Amino acid sequence: MVTSTGLLLLLGLLGQLWAGAAADSEAVVCEGTACYTAHWGKLSAAEAQHRCNENGGNLATVKSEEEARHVQEALAQLLKTKAPSETKIGKFWIGLQREKGKCTYHDLPMKGFSWVGGGEDTTYSNWYKASKSSCISKRCVSLILDLSLKPHPSHLPKWHESPCGTPDAPGNSIEGFLCKFNFKGMCSPLALGGPGQLTYTTPFQATTSSLKAVPFASVANVVCGDEAESKTNYYLCKETTAGVFHWGSSGPLCVSPKFGCSFNNGGCQQDCFEGGDGSFRCGCRPGFRLLDDLVTCASRNPCSSNPCTGGGMCHSVPLSENYTCHCPRGYQLDSSQVHCVDIDECEDSPCDQECINTPGGFHCECWVGYQSSGSKEEACEDVDECTAAYSPCAQGCTNTDGSFYCSCKEGYIMSGEDSTQCEDIDECLGNPCDTLCINTDGSFRCGCPAGFELAPNGVSCTRGSMFSELPARPPQKEDKGDGKESTVPLTEMPGSLNGSKDVSNRAQTTDLSIQSDSSTASVPLEIEVSSEASDVWLDLGTYLPTTSGHSQPTHEDSVPAHSDSDTDGQKLLLFYILGTVVAISLLLALALGLLIYLKRKAKKEEIKEKKAQNAADSYSWIPERAESRAPENQYSPTPGTDC
């Protein structure tokens, strides 16, 4: 007994020490088999969950309107302790979260969120606004409330989803968090029948003097009498029998004959009856019975205490204190036979594709690219994305099971981030034409410069019909001596044009006519100036003049004579060309002359340098000194010779 008392005393003292730091920063509400605590603190959702978990709990759940009222009551107590200055809106984390990668289900009450402590989803929800359709980041839920207003049962705190925050940035307006602690049972509060002080220390290290229900394993510290006569007693809430929890004491505490029933109704829950000697006892009203603690009353109807949980209905057995629990549709009793749990209908695979279990039921969903088939929600059929009204493709669209793909016509390639658009291919970048290339939508066409026409292959160019009608030289007049002249057939123009892909700088071919006293010669002239070189090349068809004013044709065909105006134009163009040739020749001659001059000048300089070097090598300066004879000189004449 001494050991047990010492242990209780130690637990009480340690509990008071542990709870001292948190006493001014938390509020506690205990109902049913759970306790809720509200705390101040600007923390991220992960940090708040860690704080709750340290004491054996989790961030609070709000699965029903009744539970929402318990949480609101805890917040109301917390707001009485202190309120942040200049803060109107406050948010408090609860245990509702959605992991990264999970998406929003707008047709479900929980919107795809789940409770961190586990447990089935419920139909209750109280969203502040529509949930965001995001699957790429983790989202957490907090209770949002106006801190300037007193909490009212008709205005329960709303659910607000947001990012879960970090230690450095817990989130906008985050002021604290709520924890929930579950217990196997509760003890009734201890009753004081006389003056004294009562303090409870809970297993989650909260210290309070007023609880509607005290959780299992809590320690009660009772000090009776005045300060001079104070005596401390410790009591432990423990399970006496299965499902029955008791403090281990009988009757009211701190009873004093001096006060009797006048002080706190003698500590009795219902009725207090005084004896003639100053003693008193507790009693119960009709329909109730006194429990073993001799203070608390319980209904004789076993269902009066609502023993069935999880939405179960209690049905009493006639003429006995027994009862049975019945669950609503979609639920079943667990092993305790008093708690109803949801039936997971999806285990039987009732859906064609995706099955979503809901509280008390389920619903089917189709994969992306499918839709429900008619009135049967369980069946899914393929969605034809390629219908004319909804086709996402710019050109070709092919429907597949659950999806589709786009295609482009010949001459186009796929483009866009989602590969639904088509972009024209510029075929001219590959130089498919011998001359001109013109890109068009989905194709291209080749072209030719003036005077040429496209060959049957559609790529190269040939001389046009206007060239086939022009003579290689103008027709010549033959004088037969009778005063009449006859037309002499002329040669034809040469056939094909020298091939070149770059014809942008090609000049048109022009027939030139040169007349002289003895003959008239026609010179078909083609000039091409390359865009990559500065040389000029000529393709001239030359015809030999005749001696008597006649021209000798080189072919059998004859062509009609040119007009005088054509001849004048040809002469003028020939004059320009010959002038250009003469100018180029003069420039070449000038450059050649300059080169010869520079070479000769360099040669003369070289000869002068050689001569100066030979003369200088024969002489040197000799310092003055007295010598018997003059120094030898290799250029002095040798005695006996002339040199």
From Swiss-Prot:
PROSITE patterns xrefs: ASX_HYDROXYL, C_TYPE_LECTIN_2, EGF_2, EGF_3, EGF_CA
Keyword line: Cell adhesion, Cell membrane, Disulfide bond, EGF-like domain, Glycoprotein, Lectin, Membrane, Phosphoprotein, Receptor, Repeat, Signal, Transmembrane, Transmembrane helix
Residues exposed to the Cytoplasmic side: 593-643
Gene name tied to this protein: Cd93
Naturally occurring in which organism (per UniProt): Rattus norvegicus
Protein's name in the database: Complement component C1q receptor
TM regions (residue ranges): 572-592
Subunit structure: Homodimer. Interacts with C1QBP; the association may represent a cell surface C1q receptor. Interacts with surfactant protein A/SFTPA1. Interacts with multimerin-2/MMRN2. Interacts with DAG1; this interaction plays an important role in endothelial cell migration. Interacts with CBL. Interacts with IGFBP7. Interacts with VEGFR2.
Lineage start: Eukaryota, Metazoa, Chordata, Craniata, Vertebrata
CDD domains from the UniProt entry: EGF_CA
